[in-house]
């Protein structure tokens, strides 16, 4: 066991050194280039923005993922440690790999390991997000343009600086929410709180409650996403009209507002289901929102465009 741990630690150290060398190489190349141009101030501004963005995203992502895992451990029952459960693929005749996974799960899913996973995943997410340093600086340092769009009355600076940052933030929120939900579902499954096999289909009340809360946050983020999509109509280009067309204003915009209202109602219902703890209600809400946004809305827009 000690030898295995030493091997893992050695691999981690080597990987960290390789990553560090790569970052140091990029740092020196950029520093040399900016120094040759006489713009070291710009270089340090970019570095500071990347560090601040990394720290903010890292902390927020780690807390969000860890909180989901910690809550799942707390509400997954009275068992101090997860136990293996029967797996649906064992009836497929290939039991070697699933058997190994089934034996490893109780030992892998520990509170400390979940915290470590949260930190590692958050580090990767934050590192990827440092590429958005320009969006962060543009949002922070924006100034009014002095002219407004005729449809929503927003200053042009909103579309140049705020909207791109909001869209990126929305994507991060959905991604982190999905990671947290995946970790919580894995813990509930390993603890026997979720089971789908030939003998039984079972989801515990605790899993339903936490899943409903996460789904409520998902619908809330989607409501905000549809609000942002209203402004993206001004970026439209159908080959004839650049900007919001007649169909966008009279069909797409009302549909987006209806989707915002639908997602808000679905979010409230999902949060309420944390006490009701019904399995069918979240599935019905998810099917309703996805069906409306991906099927009914495009069909309605297409029918209106064809009738003109």
Regions found by a protein language model. Name each.
Residues 157:
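Glycine-rich, often proline-containing surface loops adjacent to acidic residues and nearby aromatics
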Residues 1-32, 39-154, 163, 167-308:
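Contiguous transmembrane helix-bundle modules in multi-pass membrane proteins
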Residues 160:
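Active-site cores that bind ATP or allylic diphosphates and position pyrophosphate for catalysis
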């Amino acid at each position: 066991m000690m030898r295995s741990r030493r091997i893992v630690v050695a691999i981690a150290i080597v990987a960290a050194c390789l990553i560090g060398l790569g970052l140091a190489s990029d740092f020196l190349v950029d520093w040399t280039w900016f120094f040759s141009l006489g713009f070291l101030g710009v270089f340090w501004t970019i570095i500071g923005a990347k560090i601040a963005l990394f720290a903010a995203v890292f902390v927020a992502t780690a807390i969000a993922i860890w909180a989901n895992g910690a809550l799942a451990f707390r509400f997954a029952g009275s068992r101090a440690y997860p136990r293996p459960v029967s797996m649906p693929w064992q009836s497929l005749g290939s039991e070697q790999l699933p058997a190994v996974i089934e034996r490893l799960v109780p030992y892998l899913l520990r509170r400390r390991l979940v915290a470590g996973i949260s930190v590692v995943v958050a580090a990767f997410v934050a590192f990827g997000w440092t590429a958005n340093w320009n969006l962060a600086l543009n949002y922070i340092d924006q100034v009014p343009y002095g002219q407004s769009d005729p449809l929503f009355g927003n200053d042009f600076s909103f579309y140049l600086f705020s909207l791109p940052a909001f869209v990126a933030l929305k994507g991060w929120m959905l991604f982190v929410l999905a990671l947290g939900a995946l970790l919580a579902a894995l813990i509930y499954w390993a603890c026997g709180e979720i089971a789908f096999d030939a003998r039984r289909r079972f989801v515990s009340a605790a899993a339903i409650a936490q899943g409903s809360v996460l789904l409520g946050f998902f619908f809330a983020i989607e409501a905000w996403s549809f609000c942002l999509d209203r402004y993206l109509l001004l970026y439209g280009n159908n080959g004839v009209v650049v900007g919001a067309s007649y169909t966008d204003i009279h069909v797409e915009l009302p549909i987006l507002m209806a989707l915002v209202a639908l997602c808000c109602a679905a979010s409230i219902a999902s949060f309420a289901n944390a006490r009701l703890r019904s399995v069918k209600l979240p599935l019905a809400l998810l099917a309703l929102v996805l069906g409306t946004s991906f099927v009914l809305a495009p069909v309605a827009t297409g029918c209106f465009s064809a009738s003109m």
